[in-house]
A protein has these predicted regions:
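Phosphate/NTP-binding elements of NTP-utilizing enzymes
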Residues: 1-151
Length: 151
């Protein structure tokens, strides 16, 4: 049986990512059935845009960090692509960056390929030339950007 794009991405997350915070910090990720359904809904459909909305304290930002890493250095990565997250303030913009950076640092697999640039709020995969940046509305204009993934 052929593995779907969604199932491939679920397997990649569960193989390479680690839980960044909380009681099980550092342990391999085991996505919930709901998270798997969200991932399949995004990647097993022809859509290019997905809006994820669910209640507070349901790991939305953590799931977004996993999706970001899929596009930075995982099976969804395209060479020399740009990825962004945006927030109203610098602090808000850095939340996703901080979680994704923790996942990278805790995973020997990801840490070998991804460089974390804390002061610039960037993740860079040198092998693929992919770059993620956290942007805020406080920053100057974002003209000239052509992202393949945006949160």
């Amino acid at each position: 049986m052929t593995q779907t794009r969604g199932d491939r991405n679920i397997a990649w997350i569960e193989t390479h990512a680690r839980i960044p915070e909380g009681k099980f910090v550092g342990q391999p990720v085991r996505l919930s059935l709901f998270q798997k359904k969200v991932i399949r809904g995004i990647y097993d459909s022809p859509t290019r845009r997905a809006i994820i909305s669910f209640g507070r304290k349901n790991a939305k930002t953590t799931l977004a960090a996993f999706l970001l890493l899929l596009h930075l250095c995982g099976p969804e990565a395209r060479p020399n692509s740009q990825l962004f997250s945006a927030g109203q303030s610098r602090e808000q913009a850095s939340i996703l960056f901080s979680l994704a950076a923790k996942v990278v640092r805790m995973s020997p697999d990801l840490n070998a390929y991804v460089t974390v640039r804390d002061t610039a709020k960037q993740l860079h995969c040198g092998e693929l030339g992919t770059l993620y940046r956290a942007l805020s509305a406080e920053a100057s204009t974002a003209y000239g950007l052509s992202p393949v993934f945006t949160v």
